[in-house]
């Protein structure tokens, strides 16, 4: 066997292998950055181009999220990618500004996700109150709070060097001074106080809020789906019972088991959607923030507890930034945005126009169960076919009639929010945009 004569670089890897690894890293990171840029740019362009997307207050939060993720792709990811490929930080004193941008943009992205979850919970739990109070001004206030908090925990501590810890051990094991290490790697070791406090504000508190809100959303949606299914069965049952034979005898009414299966299918879709939202977010950011709180407590050697090698830490960092490339897919891929994207990309006629059978079930203040169903080809204007079934009041008591005459809700519908509309897409996944509040007249608010 011929002796191995390949040269080794400073990392101990063969030069050929190190070069190939750098090429693969460059390709992967370039694709990640480009996908993040494309996705979030499309969201921003769609909102600027199409007025109906700007008319929905909920989309204000999606826009803010897209802007924060776009800034991650412009101000944060490219600089770190160059450093990863080069093997050192080539931008000198820009390190501190870059660190501040990193903290600000990442925090803004996470806080915007938190605001979206609170907005959806409020819209579903208190639709009448949401419709009155969630104005564009209120939305701008929430967005301003998220961005202000992101700036406060990033630029001020970084510029005043409050975030730095006194060095106890080198990250690469061979530097002679803190300044030289930061100039070469831009790997500033955070102080324990700043690491914990910033992690609480940037991740742990928001993720706790998101878990509570999305769990509550699922419970509300589950109850609404079951009650609406019961009302569907009651409406069909009442309609069938009014059918008579030629002899004037009523036809025997029967209940179908398909409604129970449909109810289970709807609940499963809602659960799957919420699981994807939380699962992607937690999987992307949790490893980084766990390690971010562990590293400051690391001892003088990397082999001690709480110590994480620099390669693993960098992988966790990129996992977190990858969330910015996935957010447009999760939060902006409803029917409205899909049509806008198709138009912007010029594939309005080339994209497949699969039919989406959509059924809208809403209940107005008069106790009427409204079913709106239509087949909506992508890129076309939907044509609704509305069927209104009024639950017969004869099944209620005289107290129910008094409630109706007084403008109230019949007792069987009392626990069901009269302003909640659940839109169920049988061919596509359920999204949070498909659970919308409606006005007093039973019409969907925009």
Swiss-Prot record:
**How does it sit in the bilayer?**
Multi-pass membrane protein
Instruction: Name the Gene Ontology molecular function terms of this record.
Output: arrestin family protein binding; dopamine binding; dopamine neurotransmitter receptor activity; dopamine neurotransmitter receptor activity, coupled via Gs; G protein-coupled receptor activity; G-protein alpha-subunit binding; heterotrimeric G-protein binding
Name the PROSITE patterns on file: G_PROTEIN_RECEP_F1_1, G_PROTEIN_RECEP_F1_2
Q: Where is the signal peptide?
A: none
**What keywords does the record list, in alphabetical order?**
Cell membrane, Cell projection, Disulfide bond, Endoplasmic reticulum, G-protein coupled receptor, Glycoprotein, Lipoprotein, Membrane, Palmitate, Phosphoprotein, Receptor, Synapse, Transducer, Transmembrane, Transmembrane helix
Annotated Gene Ontology cellular component terms: ciliary membrane; cilium; dendritic spine; endomembrane system; endoplasmic reticulum; endoplasmic reticulum membrane; G protein-coupled receptor complex; GABA-ergic synapse
Any idea where this protein resides?
A: Cell membrane; Endoplasmic reticulum membrane; Cell projection, Cilium membrane; Cell projection, Dendrite
State the family named in the UniProt similarity comment for this chain.
Belongs to the G-protein coupled receptor 1 family.
Tell me how this protein assembles: Interacts with DNAJC14 via its C-terminus. Interacts with DRD2. Interacts with DORIP1.
Designated name of the protein: D(1A) dopamine receptor
Species the sequence originates in? Mus musculus
List the gene name.
Drd1
